[in-house]
Amino acid sequence: MEEEGIRNFKELRAKFQKFNAAPLPGPMRFPAGVSRKHDRGSTQPAQDLANRKCLSSHHHQTPSHSSTGVSQPLKNQTLKSAQGDELQKTSSSSGTPEKSTVCPERDFQKAAVPLDVTKSRAKTSNEEKGMTLSSFRYKLWNWEKVSSQNGEMSPAPLLTNGGIKTFHFEGQKTMGLAQDKPEKSLKATGAQTLPPQSHSMAQRKSPVTSKASSVSLPPHSRKSTKSPATEGSHRSSQCQPVYECELDSLVPEKPQSRHCRLPKTKPLPSIETLGPPPPKPSKPPFVNLYAFHRLPATVTKTPKEETMKEGPLSPDSAELEEAHNYDTTISYLRHSGNSINLCAEGESTEATYEIEIEELQKPWRSFFLPELSPRPKEEENTMEEKESWESEPLEPRKELHPSRPPKVVVYKETPGKTQMAGVHEDRRSVPAGNQEAMTDIMQNRLFPEDVTLTRHSQDKSGYVEALEVTKETPSPSTIRSSSSSEKTYDAVECSREDVRKWDFSSSFTSDSEENCEEMYEDIYKAKNDDPKTEVAGRTALRKLQQIFRKENVVFRMKKTKSKEIVSNGFSVSLPDLGPRSQDDSQDGIIYDDVDTREKESNDEDKVKTWKTKFLIPKGKKWGKGSQGSKSFSPRHFFRTKKQKLEKNRMEKEEKLFRERFQYGKEILVINRAVACASNSRNGMFDLPIIPGEQLEVIDTTEQNLVICRNSKGKYGYVLVEHLDFKHQG
C-alpha cells in the first residue's frame, strides 16, 4: 500500500517537473484489497445522486484558458469523490444516532497509518518542492481568481507536514458539511492515493476562511494552520456522521441575513401618551440633631462598654472632651503646690474630676504641715525637675490675683545686705487670726531656729522668710543676682524636708551657680572657699553637727532674752548676747537678728529699721499696724472691692444722666426726702420710686418736678406731691 502511494506521488511530481502543462492521468481508483465498509452510496436513490452530480458539475466549471488535459482529469476525480462523500454523509445522517457515533470512535484509532505515510512523503518531497511550486501556484492563482468572480467556488490551501502545499477546489456546500469534524476514520486495508487524499482534505476546509484567504492574501502566502495530527485525521476515510441540526448550523451565513438579525430599535413613546410629569416631592422636615450629638458625652457607660476599645470620636465629642480635659489640667496646675504629690498629679491630668475650692486650699496647708518622714535622694532629684517645669505654667496666674499678699524669701549672705529671691503666692487670703496661728506653728514646730515671719521694711504687706547663712569671710563670689537666687529658692522649696533633716541651719550657698541645685552634702563640702582647708566628707559633717548644736543653744538664749528686753522696753536694738566661744568666733557666725559692733553705721540703721517691726510684741503690733493688717483680711478685701464696684456704677449712672438730661452743672445734694407713693409717670426721664424709699434731691425745675437720685445711683424726675420732706435727717 505504501509503495503504490509513493509511486503515485512520484508520477505526480515528475509530471509537474517535466511537463508543466501536461494533463494528469485518469482518476486513481482504490485497489481491490481496500474494502469500503462505510460506503453506502449504492443504496441511495437515483434522483438524489443526479441532483448531487448537477450541483458538483455546476461548481467545478474550469476557466477557458486552462488546458483540457489538466482540467478534465481533475473534474472527473473531484466529481467522483464528491459523489461518494455525499452519499456517505446522507446515509449516516439518516441512520440512528447510536450507530453513527460508533463510526468516528472506531476510525479515530486507525488514524496513525496515513499520518506516517504523509510524513514519509513530506520528507522525500522537501528537496524538489522549489521548482514545482512556481508554475503550479501561477496556474492555481488564475483558477482561484476566476472562481472568486463567479462567487460559487472558493480555494482552500493544504499544507503537508513537510511543507508541500497542494490546493484543491471544491464546492461550498461540500466543504461546509465537513467543517467541524476533524476526526475521520481510516480504511481497514489498502492504501489511498494522493489525489483522493488531497481532495478529501480540501473538502474539510471552512468556506469563510478560504474566501478570506483568497481575497486578501497572495497564493504563495497561504499556509495551513492545522496540526499534523489533524491533517492525518483529515486524510482518513470518508466516513463521518453528521446530524441534520449540524448541517443547518454549518451553512455559512450571508451578509443580508446577518444584517437582519440586528436588534430593532424601539422608538420612545410620545409625550402625549405619557402624560404630564409627576409633581416634585416635598422637602423633608428640618430636624435638629445637635441634641443627639451631645448625648454621648452625658450618657454613663456600662461596665461592658468600658471594657471595649474606644473608636474614633466624632468632632463634636472630641472638642467637648478636649475642653473638659483642658479645664481639668488648669485645676490640677492650681493643685500642684504640694511637691510630694507632683508625680501622681502629673499622671492624672487626663482624668475628668472636678476639684472643689476646699481641695485647692490643701497644698497651702500641707506647705506649713508637711510630713516629717525624710525623702530619699532619688525622689529629691525628681521633685526638683518637676518643680522647674511646674513653675512655668504657674507664672501667668500670678497676674490674676494682684491683691494677694506675696511671700518673699531673703538670704542674708553679708551683714546688712539682703537679696530678693522671688515672690511666690502660696499664701491665700486668710483671716488675721489664722495667720497668727500659722506663724506660731512655724516658729514652734517646723522652723524653731531660723525661720520667722515679718513684715517688709517698706511696709508693702509682704512676708519675709529669713534664712541664716554662715560664712567665714564674705567674698564677691557669694553675691548672686536675682536669677540665681530664684533658682536657689526653687531648690530650697523642693527640699524643705532636707532642711529639717539638717536641723534647719544648713548653708545654701556654693562657689558657683551650678551647685545651687545639688545635694546638701556637696554644698557642705564646698562651704569653705580655701581649697587647702577642705576636709573629707565625714569629718566635715561632724564639724557641722557641732556647729549646729552651738547655734541651737545660742539661738534659744537669744530668743528668751529678746522677749524680756522688748517687754521691759529698755531698748529696741539687741546687744551681743552671751559670750561666744573661740570656735564660734573662728567660724564667723553672723545672726540676722543680732546687732554686731563691727558693722558700719549705715548697716546699723538698716538693721534697726528692720528690727523695730520684727520685734514688736503681738498686742502692740496689731494695735499699731491695724490698718495694714486689715488689708490682709478677706473681709476688708471684699469690702473695698464692693466699694469700688459701687463707685464705678455711680460714675456710669452720672455719665448717663448728664448725656440724657443735658445737665452740665455740678451735682450737689440740696435736700433729702422720702417717697410716700409710687410714681405714676413711666417716661424715659422719670425715676421709678417705691413708698418709703429715701431719695436725694439734686435740682428743681420750673414745673412741680424735681431731679432726684435713689440709693442705686439712678437719676430722674419725681413729682413733688409724692415726696415727704418731714423725715429728713
UniProtKB/Swiss-Prot annotation:
Motif (SH2-binding): 520-523
Compositionally biased intervals (Low complexity): 473-485
Sequence ranges assigned to domain SH3 in this UniProt record: 668-728
Keywords in alphabetical order: Membrane, Phosphoprotein, SH3 domain
Phosphotyrosine found at: 489, 591
Top-level lineage group: Eukaryota
SUPFAM superfamilies registered for this protein in UniProt: SH3-domain
Compositional bias segments (type: Polar residues): 69-81, 89-99, 190-216, 226-240
GO CC annotations, alphabetized: immunological synapse; membrane raft
Gene Ontology biological process terms in this record: cell adhesion mediated by integrin; integrin-mediated signaling pathway; T cell receptor signaling pathway
Residue ranges, compositional bias (Pro residues): 275-284
Entry comment on modification after translation: Phosphorylation is required for its function in T-cell activation.
Region: Disordered, residue numbers: 18-130, 170-320, 371-408, 469-490, 576-603
Biased composition (Acidic residues): 584-593
Role: Adapter protein that plays a role in T-cell receptor (TCR)-mediated activation of signaling pathways. Required for T-cell activation and integrin-mediated T-cell adhesion in response to TCR stimulation.
Subunit structure: Interacts with SKAP1, LCK and FYN. The phosphorylated form interacts with LCP2.
Name assigned to this protein: FYN-binding protein 2
Gene: Fyb2
